Every structure is written in C-alpha cells, then in structure tokens.
Amino acid sequence: MKCPYCGQLNNRVVDSRLSRSEFAVRRRRECLDCMRRFTTYEKVEDLPVMVVKKDGRREEFNRDKILSGIKKACEKRAISVDQIEEVVDSVERDFRDANEKEISSTVVGNKVMELLHRLDDVAYVRFASVYREFKDVDDFIEELKSLIPRKILEDKKPDGCSDDG
C-alpha cells in the first residue's frame, strides 16, 4: 500500500482490529520511509447497490458521498468522527442487509436525516436544508417548527412535575 504522504510502498501494520460495523478491518500503518502513520480499511467486495436518483439516473451507492455530506452538516459541532462513521455505517448496513439491488435516493436521504435527527438538531437542519433544497428562510422556519415540539418533550422532567409547585 502506498503511503499517502510520500508515495512509497515500504510500510508496516502497527495495529489491526475490526471496525465498529464489523464489516471491515481497520489497520494503522506506519511508513518506513517518512515515518508517518495512516489508516486503511479492508472489507469484502460487495455486489454494488444502485441508487436511483430523482431524475431516474442510477449510480453506485457511494459511502464517501454520504460521509462528505454528513461531515459538512456536522462541521463545528460537538460530534466526533466516530459518531459520524457510526451514522454512515448504519446507513450502509441497513441497505446492504436489505439485499436490494436498487434503492431510491429519497430513501437514502431520509435515513441519513433520521439518524442525524437523533444525533444533533443543528446537523440535521443543515443536512435537511441541502437535501430538501430549502429555497428561503421560510423553509428553515418550517423545519425548525417541527423540531420545537420534540425539544419541549425532551426537556420535560421525567416525573411530569413542574417547578411552580
């Protein structure tokens, strides 16, 4: 494997373990020329799942495309790379486990939004604004209105008592 920093092939595996999804082996490697470390993943090559776009085009399911969109939505939020990877792993696992050869881009987007909704409201709204193609502030307001009732329910005390007696 070529070192992504210096391009040399001379490296060794420092650590090897199953990824959280258990569908890949995560390897930490050290380049013996520049001494820098990098991570690689080894996984079984699957038959491709095709994503049917809104305009009818088909393209192969692309984990990196989903990862990129989620990373943008989670920028400057208190969300770890591991949490982002878990979301992507969950999306990928759900579609692979379904054993479908094709899946609509709408189903993919909705699944990502569902998982982001549970993780972080701001990341969810950011992702939704791109995915649902918000045109103006009114679109944001409508989405935020749907979040307010949920937030109120989450903030209520478990015993149902209020502070005023």
Curated annotation (Swiss-Prot):
GO molecular-function terms, A-Z: ATP binding; DNA binding; zinc ion binding
Span of domain ATP-cone: 49-139
Positions of unnamed zinc fingers: 3-34
Domain of life per record: Bacteria
Keywords: ATP-binding, DNA-binding, Metal-binding, Nucleotide-binding, Repressor, Transcription, Transcription regulation, Zinc, Zinc-finger
Cofactor note: Binds 1 zinc ion.
Any Pfam family hit: ATP-cone
GO terms classed as biological process: negative regulation of DNA-templated transcription
Cofactor(s) demanded: Zn(2+)
Disulphide bridges, residue numbers: none
Protein role: Negatively regulates transcription of bacterial ribonucleotide reductase nrd genes and operons by binding to NrdR-boxes.
UniProt family annotation: Belongs to the NrdR family.
Family annotation (HAMAP family): NrdR
NCBIfam families, A to Z: transcriptional regulator NrdR
Protein name as it appears in the record: Transcriptional repressor NrdR
Species per Swiss-Prot/TrEMBL record: Desulforapulum autotrophicum (strain ATCC 43914 / DSM 3382 / VKM B-1955 / HRM2)
